[in-house]
UniProtKB/Swiss-Prot annotation:
GO biological process: translation
Protein name: Small ribosomal subunit protein uS13
UniProt similarity note: Belongs to the universal ribosomal protein uS13 family.
Domain of life, source organism: Bacteria
Region (Disordered): 92-122
InterPro entries linked: Rbsml_uS13_C, Ribosomal_uS13, Ribosomal_uS13-like_H2TH, Ribosomal_uS13_bac-type, Ribosomal_uS13_CS
Pfam families: Ribosomal_S13
GO MF term list: rRNA binding; structural constituent of ribosome; tRNA binding
GO cellular component: cytosol; small ribosomal subunit
Length: 122
């Protein structure tokens, strides 16, 4: 198993798919990385040479923010909004949808399981 950015990527999968196991790299970014390094999209991770894996690792470390750094950056951005007490920060703090979705009905994913209201029986 190749280890890139602190993640064991599966060796039996194609390079493009295997790179998406790293938090912060999706299909589009994986294709761009492979094209930049001249790696064929159909090749599997187990077929890569040690030099190619090393180049992959260096490219990802230099050019992209992935895994822990990305998670930390996202958390800090949300914390900054909460500290500013902006509208978005208050929505994050209250556990409500941040991007203008309705909450009268729906929004169960963000609000959690429905709470029963006492005295509301027929």
């Amino acid at each position: 198993m190749a280890r890139i950015a602190g993640v064991n990527i599966p060796t039996n999968k194609r390079v493009i798919i295997a790179l998406t196991y790293i938090h912060g790299i999706g299909r589009t970014t994986a294709v761009k990385i492979a094209d930049k390094l001249g790696i064929d999209h159909a090749r599997r991770v187990q077929d890569l040479t040690d030099e190619e894996v090393l180049r992959l690792r260096e490219t990802i470390d230099e050019d992209l923010m992935v895994e822990g750094d990305l998670r930390r950056e996202t958390a800090m951005n949300i914390k900054r909004l909460m500290d500013l007490k902006s509208y978005r920060g208050l929505r994050h703090r209250n556990g409500l949808p941040v991007r203008g979705q309705r909450t009268h009905t729906n929004a169960r994913t963000r609000k959690g399981k429905a709470k029963p209201i006492a005295g509301k029986k027929k």
